[in-house]
Amino acid sequence: PQMMNTMAPRVDPAGPGSLTEAFYADPVRRYMIPVFSDRRTDWASHPQATRDSLHEHDMWVAEGLTHRYPTKVLAELLPTCPQYCGHCTRMDLVGNSTPVIDKLKFVGKPADRLGDMLDYLRRTPQVRDVVVSGGDVANMPWPRLEAFLDQLLDIENIRDIRLATKALMGLPQHWLQDDVVEGVGRVAAKARARGVSLAIHTHVNHAESVTPLVAEAAKAMLEAGVRDVRNQGVLMRGVNDTSVDLLDLCFALQDNAMITPYYFYMCDMIPFSEHWRLSLQEAQELQHAILGYLPGFATPRIVCDVPFVGKRWVHQEDSYDRVRGMSFWRKNYRTSIEAEDVDALSREYVYYDPIYTLPADGQAWWREQGDALAAHDAAIARATASREASALALG
């Protein structure tokens, strides 16, 4: 109901079908209640799209614990959410299997999985930052979540804890329950006594979703003692793909709910998401367009989550082939699966633009590629050769 009530909220009936038309055009509807006609018929999915596009499962060091960055881990406590988004980057884990898709499932018992996560963190002192997610932590009974957080706070090397919950926007009533507010207060007090930063990260994509109840829930969390409530939105066509949309959302978050605009992620390369995705060039232009309107601490960074690399500001690409829609990225650290990979820090990693955004010759090139893996390898070779030629010319 929280989401439904924000769809086409101020449309006056103007004859038969007018409300239906407004409902279909609504930006919140476009990503929360997708219909088949939303999808593109030319490129419904990118040839490089995968169900675990960030390879988080490959980097599990314990079941559900992804060690992707040098000092930070992602703890996926459970595979369910109060609401399911079509653009979910963890679509391969979150939600139930269907007759068509057999999803990844946790094997271990919840208590055993959480215990294994804590054991890994105790014996891995370089980890200081834990994103506690899922799914959505709001779907975990509060006593179990508090018990996990309490044990997490007993680990000396942990200095930052972030609770990831879209439910702060989609089901704010959860975070207003007395037992939850009181429990957050206890966890926040322990974190403060230990000098640990405790924050909540939510996921709001449009200004219409910042309702009075969302604002009440966010303020309740701040009053309970969390250091900050931050927003990590996703950049999506037809939802928030203009500077006006983004600024309206940021002002609503700041002014109405005391939520800090933090990141906007480019939509990940998962199947059937092309109608939402923007090109890197479009993201760069949007980042430029929103600068100067907000305080520096509340100016969100638009980031590209590059497979095997991690999130990078959209202007950090190493090179960019705009005809074929391929941006090339490097990194300065190894993931948990690359300890023996001598080329990890010199390798080129690729992010792909939606093919329909490319010029005609770029789209034609992709139509000729029968082998997606070969196209990927060819792109890497082409970029490498171009840089080597430039180096020789400068040399």
Regions found by a protein language model. Name each.
Residues 8, 12, 86, 93, ...:
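Hydrophobic/aromatic-lined pockets within catalytic cores
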Residues 1-20, 24, 247-395:
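Auxiliary Fe-S-binding modules of radical SAM enzymes
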Residues 1-68:
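Flexible, acidic/Gly-rich N-terminal and inter-domain linker regions that tether
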Residues 3, 24, 69, 73, ...:
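Generic hydrophobic, aliphatic-rich segments that mediate packing or membrane embedding
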Residues 111-125, 129, 135-294:
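Conserved AdoMet/S-adenosylmethionine-binding subsite of the radical SAM
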Residues 3-13, 92-100, 186-188:
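Short regulatory "switch" loops immediately downstream of catalytic or recognition motifs
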Residues 50-64, 82-96, 115, 120-125:
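A short mid-domain helix/strand-loop element embedded in enzyme catalytic domains
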Residues 67-108, 163:
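Canonical Radical SAM [4Fe-4S] cluster-binding loop centered on the CxxxCxxC motif
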